From Swiss-Prot:
Belongs to the eukaryotic ribosomal protein eL18 family. InterPro entries: Ribosomal_eL18, Ribosomal_eL18/eL18-A/B/_CS, Ribosomal_eL18_arc, Ribosomal_uL15/eL18, Ribosomal_uL15/eL18_sf. It comes from the Archaea. Keywords: Ribonucleoprotein, Ribosomal protein. This is Large ribosomal subunit protein eL18. NCBIfam families: PRK04005.1 (NF003079). It comes from Thermococcus onnurineus (strain NA1). The lineage of its organism: Archaea, Methanobacteriati, Methanobacteriota, Thermococci, Thermococcales. GO terms for cellular component: cytosolic large ribosomal subunit. GO terms for biological process: translation. It holds the Pfam family Ribosomal_L18. One of its GO terms (molecular function) is RNA binding.
Amino acid sequence: MKRTGPTDINLRRLIRYLRKKSNEEGVKIWKDIAWRLERPRRQRAEVNVSKINRYTKEGDTVIVPGSVLGAGKLEHKVVVAAWKFSETAKKKITEAGGEAITIEELIERNPKGSGVIIME
């Protein structure tokens, strides 16, 4: 079978945007995130809030090339950028004083991608 990639038009647009920003800024992190988002849905990252809590500290910035799910609890303030958030995950992140943002917003804030943790 021929590999077609994601069929969601918004995801395809995001992947093109990530590749463009990677070339413009000369930063490989955005190309890596684009590659991870391009994988089949069943191989895409699904990260629980508890994992974010376990592997980050106060003030970290995390990018999830997939979905953030609401299992567990978050005990410190972090900025989380992802393709999708569940409602409970968004609620738990904001209640902890953090932010749940889109990947595009993260690129606008930090075009060089410095200090960003990729979590899968």
